[in-house]
Amino acid sequence: MISNFDCTDNQASSKVLRPPGGGSSDIFGSEMPQTPRNVKNRMASNIFAAEKDNGVKNNVRQGAHRFYFIGDAPRRGQKTVDSHNRLFGEPTRPITPGKNHMKSSIPFGQNTEAVASAQKLLTTNGHYNGKSGSVSSASSSVSSSTENLKMNSGSRSVFRNMSTGPAVKETSLPESLCPPSPVRIEPPTPPADALSIDNSCRDSEIGDVPADNSTYTKSDQVNEACQTRRDSGNNPEQPHSLDKMAGVANIKEPLGLCPNDVKEGAQACSKLDSRNPITGLGLNGDGVGGLKPKKLKIREGNPVTGEGYKAGGNDYNQRQESSNAGTPVINKNRIPPGGYSSGLW
C-alpha cells in the first residue's frame, strides 16, 4: 500500500489521473464507439450466403488512423483502389483474342480474298487491337506471292502455247544487224627528214646555165661536192675550205705565265734578330705570339756520367777529384737527373 505521511486523508489531491490507454480507454468507464465491428467467421463458407449490407461498415478510425482514409477505403489484405480508377472510372480495354497456333494461316489453292477475310475473322474475333494486322498482312503477302506465282506460271504456259501454235512466228533478228568491229588501220608512219644529199639526182630542163657557175656540170644536176659539208676541201669556192684556212699557230711559244706559277720575291725578315726580353730566346719571326717560342736544348755529353759537357758558369761547384776505392770521378758541373733534391749525387 502507498502511504503518504505529509498530507492528510481529507486533503484533495492536485494530480489528475488519466487512464493508461488515453481518454478513449474503457478502464475508467469511458464510452465505447457505437459503430459495429465486422466479425469474420473464417470457418463458415459464404459461397451461397447473401451479400452483406454495404451500409454497415466500420469506417471510423481510432487515434491518428482516422486521418489516413476518407470514406469507404479498403483494409489491409484487400486490393488497393487505383487513383485513376477512382477519379476517371474503370478504363475500357478491348479484349484481345488468343491466337490459334495449331492452324496454319498460309492458304494454298484457295481464293485469296475469301481466305484472308475468314482468317481475319478467326484471328481477331471481330476485334482489332493493332497486333493482328501483322498476321493478316503476312498472310496477304504470302497469298499475293502465291497468286503472282500462279499468274506467272499461267502466262508462261500461254506464251509457250502461242509460240508452238500455227500462228505467225516472229522472225529472228539477223546477225547482220550487229556491225562487225572495224579493222584497225594503223596511221602511216611519216618519213624521216631526209637531207638533200640523200635525194637522188634528177634531170630537169631549166634553160641555159651561166658560164661562171662551175658547180653545175649538167642542167639542174648538182655536183656531189656541193652536197657535202662546207668545210670540205674538194670545193674551192667554199670560204671554209682547207685551202683558205689560216696557218697553225706556234703553240710552243708561251703566251704568258699562269697566275699560279708566279712567285713573289722573298722578303727579308726584320724580326729574326728580335729576342724575348723575359726568356731571352728568339721569336724566329713570330712576333704575334700565336706560336710558343722554341726552347733551345743542349744535348752534348752523357747525362749519367757527366762526360762531354762543357764547363759552364757553375765551375765553383766542382770539387777535387778523389779516387776512393777506385771509383770514377763524376763531374759535378751538371744538374743530376731529377734535380738537386733527388739525392743521386
Curated annotation (Swiss-Prot):
- Quote the protein name from its UniProt record: Microtubule-associated protein Jupiter
Which top-level group of life is the source organism from?
A: Eukaryota
What PANTHER family does the database record attribute to this sequence? GEO05313P1, MICROTUBULE-ASSOCIATED PROTEIN JUPITER
This chain's function reads: Binds to all microtubule populations.
- Record lineage: Eukaryota, Metazoa, Ecdysozoa, Arthropoda, Hexapoda
Residue list for modification Phosphothreonine: 35, 92, 96
**What are the entry keywords?**
Cytoplasm, Cytoskeleton, Microtubule, Nucleus, Phosphoprotein
Q: Which family does it belong to?
A: Belongs to the MAP Jupiter family.
Annotated region (Disordered) at 1-34, 78-100, 127-241, 300-345
Picking any one GO biological process from the record gives: positive regulation of microtubule polymerization
Q: Where is the composition biased (Basic and acidic residues)?
A: 78-87
What Gene Ontology cellular-component terms does the record carry? Answer: cytosol; microtubule; microtubule associated complex; nucleus; spindle
Q: What InterPro entries does its record include?
A: JUPITER
Instruction: Recall the GO molecular function terms of this protein's record.
Output: microtubule binding; structural constituent of cytoskeleton
Residue ranges, compositional bias (Low complexity):
132-145
Where does this one sit in the cell?
A: Nucleus; Cytoplasm; Cytoplasm, Cytoskeleton; Cytoplasm, Cytoskeleton, Spindle
Q: Which residue ranges have biased composition labelled Polar residues?
A: 1-14, 146-164, 212-226, 315-326
Q: A Pfam family in this protein?
A: JUPITER
Phosphoserine: residues bearing it: 24, 105, 134, 145
Native organism: Drosophila erecta
- Residue spans with biased composition (Pro residues)? 177-191
